[in-house]
Amino acid sequence: MTKDSPTPLGGGRASPKKPSSPGPAAAVLEEQRRELEKLRAELEGERARGRSERRRFATQTRQLRESAEQERQQLADHLRSKWEARRLRELRQLQEEVQREREAEIRQLLRWKEAEMRQLQQLLHQERDVVLRQARELQRQLAQELVNRGYCSRSGASEASAAQCRCRLQEVLALLRWETDGEQAARIRHLQAALDVERQLFLKYILEHFRWQPALPGPADPQATHSLEEPPLEAQSNTGGTPKPARRLGSLESLNTGVRVHSPNDLLPTRAGSLESLATAHSCSLDNTLNCSQASESEVRAPATSASIPDTSSPQPPPQLPSIHRKPNDLQKESSENKPCEASTSSPPGLDYQELVRQNSELAEALQVLVRRCCDLREENLHLRRKGFSEEAGEKVKWLKVKHAELTDLAQRLEDRARKLQETNLRAMSAPVPGESLEGLDLSQVFTCQRAQDLSEQAGALQAKDLQIEALRRECHLLQARIAADLGSSSHPEEGATCAQWCNISDLDRLQRESQREVLRLQRQLTLHQSKAGAWADAGRPSTPSEITRHQVQALERELGLQRRECEELSVQAAAAERRYEETEAQLQAALHKGARLSEENARLQALANWMKKMADENSNVSRQQSHTRQRQELEATSLLAEQLLQQEGYAQDRRQQLQHYKNKALSDLRTSGKEMQGLQFQPGHPSETSETTQASESQARDSGRPTFKTKSEERVLPLPTRDIQPPACLSQQENPVIVEEPAAGPQVSDRNSTSQSLDSKPQAKKTSSQSNSSSEVESMWATVPSCLSLDMDTASEVDDLEPDSMSTPLEMRSLEAPIIPKLKLFLARSSYNPFEGPSEHCQGKLPLTAGDYVYVFGDMDEDGFYEGELVNGQRGLVPSNLVEPISGSPILNHLFLKSPDIGPTALPAGHSKVLKKGSLLLGEVQERGLCQVGRVDSKTDMAAESLKTKTEACWLGLKSSLEEQSFSRPLLEAKGAFCLAPMELQLQNVTATSATITWASGSNRYPHVVYLDDEEHILTPSGVNHYTFQGLHPGTCYRVRVGVQLPRDLLQVLWETTSSTLTFDTPLAGPPDPPLDVLVEHHASPGVLVVSWLPVTIDSAGSSNGVQVTGYAVYVDGFKVTEVADATAGNTLLEFSQLQVPLSCQKVSVRTMSLYGESLDSVPAQIPEDFFSCCPFLGAPPFNYTDGNPFPVCHQKLVQASLGAKSSPRGPGNCGEPQAKFLEAFPEEHPRKHLSLSSLSSDGTNSQAQGPTEAWKGYEKDLSFQKSPQNHKPPLLFGQSGVEEGHAPHICISGSPAPGFVHLSSEIGHGKIRCWEKPGLEKALLQNQYAPMVPPHQQGSSQCQPADFHHVFEEKEALCLDSQGTEKPEQRKNKSQNGQRQGTPGSKRECSVLCPAPTNKVIKMTSGSPDQLETDANNPVRVFLALFDHSPLVISVNSEAAEEELAFQKGQLLRVWGSLDLHGFYHGECNGHLGKIPGHLVVEVEVGTQQTDGRWHLPAQGHLLSETQREDLEGLTNSQGSYMPQGNSRTPTLWTPKTMVAALDYDPRDGRAGVQAKGKLVLRAGDVVTVYGPVDDKGFYYGEYGGHRGLVPAHLLDDLPVHGE
């Protein structure tokens, strides 16, 4: 075969067609059917994607609708707020405008009032001036008339002139009275009364002295004369008695003063009218009497005889009565008119001249008395005017009257306006506004109506009286006219007529007086009725006019204030009503605007919905078109593929023929070479093996006569794109041929894909291999090597490969099967794993694990029990199946394939995991076996590194380059970074009433996560942290937790589908507190006393656990309470033998937490030491007890097969060789493990120094004794049973109840004897048990024996040194305290050390400390770490703030570290004099037990080498803080270490079949992994934990978790 003849399909050697193989047509049809199925599957996938797109569009539509609704709501709220602000602003403006208008209106009204007042004052001044001028004129006229009073006595005077004179006098008196009334209203009434009295006296005097008879011809009658003479005497007596009129005047004045009116504004106009009418009536009567008197006087003065007045009176009607406002000009005209009448009147003759002179003189005296009286009255008036009644007071009274009238008018106008406003408001408002009352308005209206009614009644009464007075006045006029007519009708009447005339005159006088009295009485009653409220307290002292005026002013002011307040209230009510009307109108307008806006928004949303619907239709159309196009393309590709297959089939036929030709040629060549070899056999010196080789070649050639070829269906299993693009998969390229060397040439190993060597060479290769692998590993390595043709070999090599090719057909068929899409599963690492610490020498391809890490697993487990997996940080490699557990029901099983489409086409061929697993061997064997060429045709050749640096980087960086070159797809990390950023597997764990813990699987380990609680940012966790615990929650509350990825700014622009996950949970109600942990029962120094210790529950600052207050702890023994401790922080108590109920049968001790709401559940029970009841009270020193129950499943058959029953002698250091050998034979695949080393104790009481770690290790490697300890039995060697020499101090015996799988080790060093327990060396069982979930330790001390670690045993560096007297030396106590601190777990909450020196010293020392104190203690040991990589936090870290706290270091640098890892995965340490944080995944701890080989220090824990310089630095670091002490294992199991079991059946305690008591039981499904604590109780239940919940589980439903490989 030549180089230019490639194989048709690659992957298998071509061979002639078998007779039983199907025809090409059937193969083509089968291929087409498969293609159609594939197309159908793709079509279904496209449909599924279309449905997902539709759902996505529906989700976007809903989001848009929700966002539109939110925007609309925000816009509505914004507009509402703007509208309210605008409404308030407009309302304020309207209020200000109304207030300004009111103020302007009030100012305008005041200006109008002031103008009106000024006008009224001007009018009043004008009227006053006119009245004063008239009064002065009348006074002047009266004086002139009085001076000329003698005109009646003249001879030429007539009766008419006398009457005219009397009329003028009457008018002057009337005008004088009204002048006084104009000046002072009170003085007018006084003068009127006085004038009335004088007028009456004057009239009486006239009537009495002028009753003459008409003149008769006969002589005068003496009786008449006597009668005429008597009146003068009476007149003299009357006129001369001036005191009588004075007294009358005083009485009338006092009467007038007593009835003075207090409210002149109401009664003054009416009174003025009535007084005017009275004055008019009196003036008429006075004029008549004066006329008669003047006539009689003229008759008397006449020289003729006296004649009667009726005879001499003229028949003319009486003259017109003068009016009050008659001017002086009118009086002069009247006087001029009356003069002719007087002249024409003739005096009656017959009277005696002397008599007439005497009468005239008497009349003149009477007139003088009257004149004097008038002068006195005038003087008195002037005196009173000067005394108190000034013009200013009168003007003030008048101004107050006018002001009152104006205010009354204003009040009436305001009432009208208020009534109009109220009517308007009632029309505008349908209902009154609550809180406002109309009481003030109603009271104002009632007050106004009542006042108007009173005024109307008063005015009506006064008008009625005025009408009565007017009627009486008319009667008086009629009577006077009638009298005057009767007197002038006949000049000579008879005596009877005269008597009737005088009788009528007397009746008239009587009627007039009665009418005057009636008027005065009515005025007095009205005045008293109006002035009841203002009556003076002192009735005897009359009120002065000034006080009356002041009281009137005060009353007016009070009334004015009331009216002002009423006006203000009405104004406020009117403004409020107007404001309510405006608000209502504004609300109406706002509602209209809002309705319009909502309609517009609705229209917009409707348009948007229509647009979205249209877009969805268009999208569906486009999707259909795309699907049709894709189907058409697929059909075209299928037809093209069919054509290619037909062509390839023809080519395959040609190839078969060519191969047959090559085969025949090879056979001929083989025969020729056989002949040549036979010829060479007979040559001397040729080895005998040549014949055997020739025979083997001939047999191979004969067997190769039946060549086998894979069928077409098997060849077409490869993916179509791979077959179309890639050439035949042969790792030996034509350009770079590889010559396979002879097996005897050396230990080099050819390519894994090459099968040119025969099967017989495989054992030879295994023999020549220098590696110490087990047979199963080697067989699995060779079984997974895929075969491939090398087209550029010579003919001899092809002939040699014929038979192996036929035998490797099953391998080829398996290697060329269809690459199924790898099944991705999510696993959880149960415990930590470091491949460098294991027995395997090829650990470069294995992944280091940390407990709690998530591992993505591809495919199924291989035959060696390894998975192909990848960590979240991108590292890939092999994962032991016994260290991880699958997460059932994980959504990530299908989530990653949906999110990353590039994972689908990538296939892992069969055995590829082995290529990765065994590829790690190439890195370790590259210097011994040579170069290995691994990769695809189109990839570059990957050369194995020759240095340790290359191997280290390949191990820690996940062999990325090797994975890429070995056809492994790397889309997982990129897919997670691009598609799966949201945290997955968000789960809830450890939910209490006040706290909860969440965990998640990081979608991307490169970015930090933000934890939200109820949609509020709670905390920012750094990258790599996948759990968080909430504290301070409220019991019985629903919380919503969301965990999201915080992306950098450059990635925020990318449209991620989701970057967060949400979880909702409810905290339980504040229930019973949590039970205590780590209950331990130990011996006390006193016999018969037990020490029960526990770890107190975690309480908050308020002293509560699970939401309730903790009060103490109760100790139960087999379910019976024996004692209580009333302390929430107590950690131990003493239990005496007498307190046990049934001492010999008591086994379990449990502790409960007490609270006010009851007790908690039982803690994990602790076993009472079995030797407690059989222990003698006189023992020298009670032993330390530690019970370590670790029931992990082990291979008990192999343990039984081992002969471990030999007993060890007290001092035989070499008696453990044979049992150890037998034990190791039972487990051939295991490697020697390190053992627990304890320093020897001083036997003679002297100070004994502890052995160093190297010496102790060497010593214990030599002195080991194994003893089989069956379960539930005491150890064969107890304290006191071994030979103890006399004189030696008692030893400290560390013993306990043995557990299955433990081997009792007993060794003696010097005189000290130490027993310890070590677990058997079964690796898989050890790994499974170590990484099972278990309770973290909380109690470590000298009283316990640290259990052996599974990879390196925790070595104890200090010994307890006690002298013979039981005392402890200071330096030993110091060393022991430091050792206890180093052994204490950083996360532990309590450290207990029990000192048991001598039997007489019964001392128990308990030390406790918080985690903070342990971590921050200055005595914490210093740990030394080695940097594996360069670290620059400012360049690598995403968070710049966190980068400032990290330390920068270089690869190979030694770092000093204090404490353990924090929650974020960082150490606290020192580098180059700087303190800060150190990432835990970039450093490795340097153990003290390093060994020096060839000038380099080797670290057995990690496989790194240290140079001498680094070794010196290490010694300097450790010596600076004292001798270095390694830290103990942080995962040391406590009492009843949890056991992992699997549920065989479904179990739901809530249904009726499982029983009624469902509380406190777990719900399980078949296959669930349950962590069990403690043994089975008396009811057949385990106490276990599953999914973060704890409860009881039936024991018959659980099975032990099987061990792989058993």
UniProtKB/Swiss-Prot annotation:
Domain of life: Eukaryota
SMART domains assigned: FN3, SH3
Coiled coil region boundaries: 24-146, 352-431, 461-649
Any one GO CC term of the record: cytoskeleton
UniProt xrefs under CDD domains: FN3
Keyword Chaperone: no
Annotated tissue distribution: Specifically expressed in testis, where it localizes to postmeiotic germ cells (at protein level).
Span of domain SH3: 822-889, 1420-1488, 1536-1603
Phenotype seen when the gene is deleted: Males are almost completely infertile, but otherwise have no visible phenotype. Sperm morphology is highly abnormal with deformed nuclei, detached acrosomes and an expanded perinuclear space. Defects are first apparent from the round spermatid stage and are associated with abnormal development of the manchette.
Main location: cytoplasm
Subcellular location: Cytoplasm, Cytoskeleton
SUPFAM superfamilies reported for this sequence: Fibronectin type III (SSF49265), SH3-domain (SSF50044)
Transmembrane intervals: none
Comp. bias regions, Polar residues: 750-761, 1377-1386
Biased composition (Low complexity): 17-27, 688-699, 769-780
Functional description taken from the UniProt entry: Component of the manchette, a microtubule-based structure which plays a key role in sperm head morphogenesis during late stages of sperm development. Important for male fertility.
Family designation: Belongs to the RIMBP family.
Quaternary structure and interacting proteins, as annotated: Interacts with FASLG. Interacts with LRGUK (via guanylate kinase-like domain). Interacts (via C-terminus) with HOOK1 (via coiled-coil region).
Protein name: RIMS-binding protein 3
Record gene name: Rimbp3
